[in-house]
Amino acid sequence: MSVDAALKALAEPRRREILRLVWSQERPATEIADHFREVSRSAISQHLGVLKEAGLVFERRDGTRRLYRADRDEMKKLRAFLDDYWTTGLERLRDVAEAAQRKKETK
């Protein structure tokens, strides 16, 4: 999974909604498309392709149907990447706050 591709894929609200739909269970493309009545099936197919290319969903064929489910392992990697940024940022903030407190106490 490319973090850049995953973040770009998740920047689109419909793709995030698709990911929510396939998070807990595998769903056929037709069922996913039915959830978005205001969007064409080809647009949903393109969204699914972007999510698949980004490594966020698996596609499985069952006869003529295409079934999709979230790739939770890849999502864990993305979360770890984001957690690292969050943790690093919080650690820096803590260090600055502690330095300011020490400076205040020595005055």
Annotated model-derived regions:
Residues 57-59, 74-77:
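Alpha-helical interaction segments
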Residues 1-2, 20, 24, 75-107:
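Amphipathic alpha-helical dimerization/coiled-coil segments
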Residues 48-49:
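Short, hydrophobic-biased segments on the C-terminal half of alpha helices
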Residues 2-40, 65-76:
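N-terminal helix-turn-helix DNA-binding core of bacterial DNA-binding proteins
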Residues 52-63, 69:
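Beta-hairpin "wing" of winged helix-turn-helix
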